[in-house]
């Protein structure tokens, strides 16, 4: 019974499926009861076949695609296509609705086309039906081969990788439709390099050998070919892959030599490169972890070997100073290894490599060596000793030359000490610890040859001399005290509390004792036994008229050995006070007036400067008076100052010619004969006067006397203006007798004056001759 029910249900489902398409194909229809009328309006629909076309279709164009058909039956019906490709790629027969393709189609360029179908009236061009959109799909054919995304690939993989290590993922693309079976599937195949690599899966390259050694072959080139499932391949279906092997630390260092020999001087600096130990390690620098060590010999603390991965070498450096006199040769065995290497990469290779190193030390003339790095001596102050301490330096070389000692005078402290040829230090003056408690000396040791001459090799050492204290300073006040007391102070009034210090080294148990040097009538000193003392009023009530300041000599003693006692004076000022005991009037003790040496020196220099200035003024005035006494005025003397670039002849420049001759010629006089030089020296040129009894002279006696009188008056006229005084004339010009006094406005020139006689006066007057003489070249210009 249950089986029958299940069969009936299945039959009902099947009938429902059969009736569903009918309903779907007529969406405009509605089921109505049989009682309703059967007359209703039916909608017109487009009718055409499914539009599909193969790409790259063979045959002559055009190619039939399909038919569009409308349910409208009208004799004037016309079909049209609209769209981007309508009229170019696709056309429709306006009468039948057949659609044709007029070009070969490529699905990889355009997989489908969207068009719009129209049905219009031929006469009116009006739409008889609503436009309908439809699609023409291009069917794919297997007309494309796989193409790599790039022609060259670069990849890397560590050397000595295990088989199956991924290297790179290649990608090739087939432009065909992937939904069509086997059209877009890609098959990869190695064309070159299959002995070291392989392809697994879709383009994954893996290692196929475990012996990929970068030091043997650093790079591999493989060629990969692609094709689709149907075996279609082309020129673009291959790609080249360059695979670089990455270096790993898989090689041990090996010495390039089994024996290394070096020769170095004994004065090589500690830490300086001594030599290089080259090793062979084909790994790259970042994987060279060479470790050098000394395996045989007792010199592990004498030398060190620092690796240099870049140059693939180990650098030997001394850790201690070398001494030829002690060891002339070092011989030891070294080992090179790499502790970071992966032992899985080794194949029977030794993990260690050894070599022999021999270092020969050569002798160098070294400076003297002091036995100690520094010296410390002690000396009591106020003591002069012929020997404080000794320094000792020796020649480390085999020659064992003698040594000379000296103290560098780097400061004034060095003048207190001396050193003899044996290195014994002594003081030449007594020392005061309170001035300098320490003396730091620099002692030089110089190597001397057989004649006692320094060879240039020297060394220095620091010597520290400590001055020990002696009780040679008496105690004194700790500070200056300004004690004051009221004139009506009562008995027992505390005036001031005093304390003491000692410039000597003060021990913890130092004790100072205080006492008055003389008994005072009105002050009392009380020792507190704690290195302080109180000064109090003894009777009270002071008289300011009798004494405004009281001077108390106080004795202060220490407990040193020997005990010293010092005297310090305390000055107590008596002041007027108010009722509250406040000081209202005090006369402080004036400081002693004195003049220091510096002030005296300054005063003396000022007095000396004033005296020198006064003397210079006096000498200048005296020289001016002497010049006037010679009978020459200042303007005449000034006229004889001739400036030129040639060397002068001293007094001969003033005695060899007469300035008055030049003046007479400049004022239009005739050319005079050259005067004879006077044999005796003269300060001024002698004026060549005409003889007293020359023919044509009028009244020679009277005229000569008058000229002499006028000349003396002019020479001794102290009230006359100086020669460089500016003369101001009230009127000047054409209406004046003198007209213009300026040389710029005159029409006359000195061209008619003959100065050729200057050429006869010698080379000293060459400059004047060139300035005033005629130039023969000027005559050629006219």
From Swiss-Prot:
It is a single-pass type I membrane protein. Residues 23-44 form a propeptide. The chain crosses the membrane at residues 599-619. Residues 45-598 are extracellular. Its main location: other. Ca(2+) 3 binds at residues 142, 144, 174, 176, 183, 228. One of its GO terms (biological process) is regulation of complement-dependent cytotoxicity. Residues 1-22 form the signal peptide. Keywords: Calcium, Cell adhesion, Cell junction, Cell membrane, Cleavage on pair of basic residues, Cytoplasm, Glycoprotein, Membrane, Metal-binding, Phosphoprotein, Repeat, Signal, Transmembrane, Transmembrane helix. Ca(2+) 2 binds at residues 55, 108, 140-141, 143, 176. It is found in: Cell junction, Adherens junction; Cell membrane; Cytoplasm. Residues 620-659 are annotated as: Required for interaction with PALS1. Residues 45-148, 149-255, 256-370, 371-475, 476-592 form the Cadherin domain. Residues 620-782 are cytoplasmic. Phosphorylated on tyrosine residues by KDR/VEGFR-2. Dephosphorylated by PTPRB. O-glycosylated. GO terms for cellular component: adherens junction; bicellular tight junction; catenin complex; cell junction; cell-cell junction; cytoplasm. Cadherins are calcium-dependent cell adhesion proteins. They preferentially interact with themselves in a homophilic manner in connecting cells; cadherins may thus contribute to the sorting of heterogeneous cell types. This cadherin may play a important role in endothelial cell biology through control of the cohesion and organization of the intercellular junctions. It associates with alpha-catenin forming a link to the cytoskeleton. Plays a role in coupling actin fibers to cell junctions in endothelial cells, via acting as a cell junctional complex anchor for AMOTL2 and MAGI1. PANTHER family: CADHERIN-23, CADHERIN-5. Part of a complex composed of AMOTL2, MAGI1 and CDH5, within the complex AMOTL2 acts as a scaffold protein for the interaction of MAGI1 with CDH5. The complex is required for coupling actin fibers to cell junctions in endothelial cells. Within the complex AMOTL2 (via its N-terminus) interacts with CDH5. Interacts (via cadherin 5 domain) with PTPRB. Interacts with TRPC4. Interacts with KRIT1. Interacts with PARD3. Interacts with RTN4 (isoform B). Three calcium ions are usually bound at the interface of each cadherin domain and rigidify the connections, imparting a strong curvature to the full-length ectodomain. This is Cadherin-5. It comes from Sus scrofa (Pig).
């Amino acid at each position: 019974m249950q089986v029958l029910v299940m069969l009936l249900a299945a039959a009902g489902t099947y009938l429902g499926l059969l009736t569903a398409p009918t309903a779907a194909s007529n969406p405009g229809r509605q089921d109505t009861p049989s009682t309703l009328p059967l007359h209703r309006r039916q909608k017109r629909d487009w009718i055409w076949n499914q539009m599909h076309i193969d790409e790259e279709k063979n045959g002559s164009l055009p190619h039939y695609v399909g038919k569009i058909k409308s349910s409208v039956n009208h004799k004037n019906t016309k079909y049209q296509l609209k769209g981007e490709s309508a009229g170019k790629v696709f056309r429709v027969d306006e009468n039948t609705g057949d659609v044709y393709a007029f070009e070969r189609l490529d699905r990889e360029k355009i997989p489908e086309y969207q068009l719009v179908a129209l049905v219009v009236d031929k006469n009116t061009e009006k739409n008889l039906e609503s436009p309908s959109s439809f699609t023409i799909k291009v069917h794919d054919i297997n007309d494309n081969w796989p193409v790599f995304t790039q022609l060259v690939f670069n990849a890397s993989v560590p050397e000595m990788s295990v088989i199956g290590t991924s290297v790179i993922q290649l990608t090739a693309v087939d432009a065909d439709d992937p939904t069509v079976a086997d059209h877009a599937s890609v098959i990869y195949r190695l064309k070159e390099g299959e002995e070291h690599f392989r392809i697994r899966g879709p383009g994954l390259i893996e290692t196929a050998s475990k012996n990929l050694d970068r030091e043997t072959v650093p790079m591999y080139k493989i060629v990969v070919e692609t094709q689709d499932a149907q075996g279609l391949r082309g020129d673009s279906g291959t790609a080249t892959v360059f695979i670089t092997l990455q270096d790993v630390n898989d090689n041990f260092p090996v010495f390039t030599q089994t024996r290394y020999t070096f020769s170095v001087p004994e004065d090589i600096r500690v830490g300086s490169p001594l030599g290089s130990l080259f090793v062979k390690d084909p790994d790259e620098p970042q994987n060279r972890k060479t470790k050098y060590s000394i395996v045989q010999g007792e010199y592990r603390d004498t030398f060190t070997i620092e690796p240099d991965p870049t140059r693939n070498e180990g650098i030997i450096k001394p850790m201690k100073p070398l001494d030829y006199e002690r060891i002339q040769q070092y011989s030891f065995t070294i080992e090179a290894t790499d502790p970071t290497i992966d032992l899985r990469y080794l194949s029977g290779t030794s993990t260690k490599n050894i070599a022999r190193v021999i270092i020969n030390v050569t002798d160098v003339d070294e400076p003297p060596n002091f036995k100690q790095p520094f010296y410390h001596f002690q000396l009591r102050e106020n003591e002069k000793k012929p020997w404080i301490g000794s320094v000792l330096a020796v020649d480390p070389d085999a020659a064992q030359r003698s040594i000379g000692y000296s103290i560098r005078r780097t400061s004034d402290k060095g003048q207190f000490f001396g050193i003899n040829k044996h290195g014994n230090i002594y003081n030449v003056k007594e020392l005061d610890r309170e001035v300098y408690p320490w003396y730091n000396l620099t002692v030089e040791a110089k190597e001397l040859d057989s004649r006692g001459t320094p060879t240039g090799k020297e060394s220095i050492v620091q010597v520290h001399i400590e001055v020990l204290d002696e009780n040679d300073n008496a105690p004194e006040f700790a500070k200056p005290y300004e004690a004051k007391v009221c004139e009506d102070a009562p008995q027992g009034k505390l005036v001031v509390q005093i304390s003491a210090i000692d410039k000597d080294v003060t021990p913890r148990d130092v004790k100072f004792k205080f006492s008055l040097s003389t008994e005072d009538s009105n002050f009392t000193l009380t020792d507190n036994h704690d290195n302080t003392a109180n000064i109090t009023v003894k009777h009270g009530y002071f008289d300011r008229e009798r004494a405004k300041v009281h001077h108390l000599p106080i004795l202060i003693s220490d407990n040193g050995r020997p005990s010293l006692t010092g005297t310090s004076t305390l000055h107590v000022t008596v002041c007027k006070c108010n009722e509250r005991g406040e000081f209202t009037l005090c006369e402080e003790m004036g400081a002693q007036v004195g003049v220091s040496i510096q002030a005296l020196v300054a005063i003396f220099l000022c007095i000396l400067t004033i005296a020198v200035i006064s003397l210079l003024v006096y000498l200048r005035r005296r020289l001016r008076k002497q010049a006037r006494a010679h009978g020459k005025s200042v303007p005449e003397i000034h006229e004889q100052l001739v400036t030129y670039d040639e060397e002068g002849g001293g007094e001969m420049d003033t005695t060899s010619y007469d300035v008055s001759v030049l003046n007479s010629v400049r004022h239009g006089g005739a050319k005079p004969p050259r005067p004879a030089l006077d044999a005796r020296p003269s300060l001024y040129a002698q004026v060549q006067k005409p003889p007293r009894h020359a023919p044509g002279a009028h009244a020679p006696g009277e005229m000569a006397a008058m000229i002499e009188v006028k000349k003396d008056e002019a020479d001794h006229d102290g009230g006359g203006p100086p020669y460089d005084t500016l003369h101001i004339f009230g009127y000047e010009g054409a209406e004046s007798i003198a007209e213009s006094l300026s040389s710029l406005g005159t029409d006359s020139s000195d061209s008619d004056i003959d100065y050729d006689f200057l050429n006869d006066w010698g080379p000293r007057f060459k400059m004047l001759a060139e300035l005033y003489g005629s130039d023969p070249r000027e005559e050629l210009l006219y």
